[in-house]
């Protein structure tokens, strides 16, 4: 069987920054109903099936082998938000997860917020995008894609009655609640280019929709969120090299304010605590530094430096809590967490292995002494920890079980460096059976 060849229909594309000819623009059928496009996609699928046909048995064998090592009936570590513990669980032979919560009290019954398997009934596919609970815990804003084109519809569920108002907005990329529990903000992508460029305010019943912002520069996308403190709604406008942030106090009327004027090449992000914004910014160099400014009168020239710029350390993220903040850094290719007090003291979370991967976990609570993170390595399965900033200890909450007789102690992992021709040290991560190198010079 010969592979299908897409025909060429030259189409001129113009923008502020470029002009080009796209021979395959005709394939951008957003209605999913153009017969010629559908015929071509069917031909591509048929060709794939034909080429892969000899491997059918091997595909099934590999699938069953990998499935045998996965615990299908499982539950994630719950995280606290307000007066509830939220979690996601999976069930054997079910394709999609179930999202649940329990009240923060003994013997509280489980509340199912979203059963993705039930939502998928009658559909070939479903994907959950954003998932935001209102401050009072009574409303859930969530987005779903049922076609596989990553175009999400916004729905609102009443968590008291269980009723859902479907599709109050379309092509939604991000969503966040205002503090009145009745107003939402969301960003929307363009139907053709898929660039996220529109920012709306809307009531939870789908009424009173207002366009707040339209980003006209085609190089930029936008996204909205609320700070962990719950005090500010932030609109992030960014290209691959430049950031601009707009912000507004929750619950207050008025326009969004620009944090710093847009400047080509300047990137930054913010979090909030008290009267200050804590900002990760690259004004001193590509590796970023951390500064703070007065939230209601942010002037970069008057910023207080919290973490200085360093040539060998990349600052990747900052998370503010009520009594501490965490700076995520990368040095020599490895992530570490600097736990910082607002008085200036700081220390790192220690890891035992020399080769590992780590990422911040579900840290939604602002008033907490715990920092959650995920950790894994070549020999350590994905593990969830809570780090106590007072005792400086990490508590293992869950480790992903690996079925099939895997024993981590039978293996070793190390990290070595090799020098390139320009004397640059290149990290090399090794994993091997314990004892395999014994007797070697």
What are these regions (language model features)?
Residues 19-57, 61-84, 88-112, 117-441:
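Peripheral, non-catalytic segments that deliver or gate enzyme domains
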